[in-house]
Amino acid sequence: MTFKYEEVTPSAAEFCELRVAAGLSAKSLKAAQIALPNSLYAISIRKEGSLIAMGRVVGDGACNFEVVDVAVDPNYQGMGLGKRVMEYIDMYLSSVALEGSYISMIADEPAFYEKLGYRLVSPSCQGMTKKFNPCN
């Protein structure tokens, strides 16, 4: 199988579709249209023009980086594409992260990321979240 690797964000519609297909939480098209251009880095994998895997890095570009939106179409899971997405992300991070930079993620599949060298921070730290009502 031939895959095309593009270091660009997908379209907002593709992004929203792949998130849902891969089992991630749904995002509105409006949110995606605002968020994607603010990515520090993105990798998209395509087969015959269709988006089948993706991942992004967001943050301030120096002190904090967050790995987000790592998703693989269920029809292509188990082929190493998630690992390839993370290899591209890790190459980017290794080229820009400074001493003391903090790289984080909310890992839906911690065992997958641990195989790639990422470590759980608990019990020394705990992830937290807070939901806000839509502003529109």
Feature map (PLM): residue ranges:
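Short amphipathic alpha-helix that is part of the acyltransferase structural core
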Residues: M1-K30, S124
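Conserved active-site tyrosine of GNAT-family acetyltransferases
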Residues: Y113, Y118
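Conserved catalytic-core motifs of GNAT/GCN5-like acyltransferases
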Residues: G100-S104, R119-N136
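A generic "binding-loop/recognition-motif" signal
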Residues: C63, D108-A111
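Conserved acetyl-CoA pyrophosphate-binding loop and the N-cap/start of the following alpha-helix
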Residues: Y76, G80-Y88
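Conserved GNAT acetyl-CoA-binding A-motif
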Residues: M86, L93-A107
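A conserved beta-strand-loop-helix scaffold within acyl/acetyltransferase catalytic domains
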Residues: A31-A71
